[in-house]
Amino acid sequence: MDGSSPLLAAAGSDGDRSSSEGEYTLAGGPSAGDTEKREGESPMEAAGAGTVGFSISRLDTLSALRLNRTRPAADTELRYLHLLWKPGELLQAGRSTPGKITSSRVRRLARARRNMGPIGKDLHAVKRLREAANSNDIDTVRRLLEDDTDPCAADDKGRTALHFSSCNGNETIVQLLLSYGADPNQRDSLGNTPLHLAACTNHVPVITTLLRGGARVDALDRAGRTPLHLARSKLNILQEGDSRSLETLRGEVTQIIQMLREYLNIMGQSEEREKLEHISTQLQNTRTREQVDEVTDLLASFTSLSIQMQNMGDR
């Protein structure tokens, strides 16, 4: 016997009301020490506590509990069932309802309990992680990851924290997320991977980091573009512009070489990798803007040739 009365059983089974709508129970008879315990009672509890009481006899030799009704009455049961489903009539009758809980308050309390549960906390944490990644808040990202927040949790559009940080070009956050197990190949609802988003926004260092973290190059772009195509586009921009300083230009060309190095390693193209290393050495020895431009042109030609060879191999 679990200690529940027939009244409680009937109330719980009639329609199986959702817990979010609140659950009402009948308490025992009032006593001087029950004041603090009765603060959260429903109107039905407040009205019925003094009319129907329950007592439990001592355990017999079979260790069974016998529940004894002190004042049973069929019409009283029906009356309290009626009050259970229509608690508002207590107010209309002018009865005192200390500690009453309205249905809206019950729903709010139930919602608050759900939100403070493990699932609610997790949902809040992963949302904060995505927001922090999108706003480049690395301190919050690190703290949430240290608290075991899932880095692969996506929003309703399939976007993860890694998608946001890759699109923003934040290499530090991308590396941090990868170190905590973020999936570089996870797709959003449109089929985009973090690598694809980094490519679309021309964030070469992020692409390099994603490639090192295990990103699949064949999932870079649904249009079939690879880091080679991105490198060529980036180099074309560098060749057309002349506003960059020598160090800035050298740094951007170096980033492109690093990206291509990771890509060629994944593809297993050792011969192409050797040619790239030769170009990288030439870049390191440059001292003037003209020399950097020459290396840039050489790298652009290398990239175009590699794309042609790749296209021939795909046929």
UniProtKB/Swiss-Prot annotation:
PROSITE patterns: ANK_REP_REGION (PS50297), ANK_REPEAT (PS50088). Keywords: ANK repeat, Cytoplasm, Nucleus, Repeat. ANK repeats lie at residues 124-153, 157-186, 190-219, 223-255. It is found in: Nucleus; Cytoplasm; Midbody. It comes from the Eukaryota. Residues 1-49 are annotated as: Disordered. One of its GO terms (cellular component) is cytoplasm. Its main location: nucleus. Coiled coil: none annotated. GO terms for biological process: regulation of intracellular signal transduction. Plays an important role in regulating intracellular signaling events associated with erythroid terminal differentiation. PANTHER family: ANKYRIN REPEAT DOMAIN-CONTAINING PROTEIN 54, ANKYRIN REPEAT DOMAIN-CONTAINING PROTEIN 61. This is Ankyrin repeat domain-containing protein 54. It comes from Danio rerio. The gene is ankrd54.
